[in-house]
């Protein structure tokens, strides 16, 4: 029988800690996985103690997922190379702007049979334009990478409330392996082969959620927010089709949890919506609100809107994506929040 697969979780924020609860529990039950799960923790001090030591003694991430115990077989490791040493399965769940540096650091220390899955909701811009996070990991580390996206608010997953998720995998065998690692009776997973679209959904919906939050801050009501969701979905589909490498975008993928379901839950319950609402109401900067509302964690929606805007500008396509553009300009160019409504009124869908 093959040796059990060693698992490393790269990241330990709110979502990383929630997913560690599932992985730790499944690794204890399933013989194909090594019982000990290493979780890389970006070391910081919390109430005078190292976060990694708190996690390993109290079995709780008191900073990013307070109130939820982690299984005792999940071990916090502050040195990334130590955490990833000999790992067969890598679960990436860090803010997308750090992924290149982390991959560089892990080079040469993972197993020869290593495979990865990214839960990172973001994209990058390279010299040729759009760059998916999975592509960066694949190129830097030379491993196959699947993606998991879905309507998965971290605290609800941690509380074991029922939800669905989608794995996109170009190698079906690897997608099914990660399904075994991650699925529970309350976290149900579908595996599809349209991996790039699954990943794009996870990134682009955060831009739409910022727009939904602006509407909430302006007290526009549910009808307006429904329009933001619909027009945002149209722009997500158009963007995916525009940038697909091989015309492989399937409309059916947008009906999976990674698509319309994730879009709805994020526009009603996610942190991007919440911070955008506060931005509209208070006039404080995104950076100030991240510190106040997210313990300093980075908000992905505004960052992704900037990356998308630069890609669209490079391609001369800004005017075809007015909702994405409005979010970027409100966040970064001091345009008034009310421009969100103007963009809906004059959206090409209505002309």
Curated annotation (Swiss-Prot):
Residue numbers binding NAD(+): 11-16, 154, 271, 298, 300
Subcellular localization(s) per the UniProt record: Cytoplasm
Active site: 205
Recorded GO MF terms: glycerol-3-phosphate dehydrogenase (NAD+) activity; NAD binding; protein homodimerization activity
Binding-site residues, substrate: 121, 271-272
SUPFAM superfamilies named among the record's database cross-references: 6-phosphogluconate dehydrogenase C-terminal domain-like (SSF48179), NAD(P)-binding Rossmann-fold domains (SSF51735)
Enzyme class: oxidoreductase
InterPro entries found in the cross-reference section: 6-PGluconate_DH-like_C_sf, 6PGD_dom2, G3P_DH_NAD-dep, G3P_DH_NAD-dep_C, G3P_DH_NAD-dep_euk, G3P_DH_NAD-dep_N, NAD(P)-bd_dom_sf
Keywords associated with the record: Cytoplasm, NAD, Oxidoreductase
A single GO BP: carbohydrate metabolic process
Protein known as: Glycerol-3-phosphate dehydrogenase 1-like protein
Organism: Danio rerio (Zebrafish)
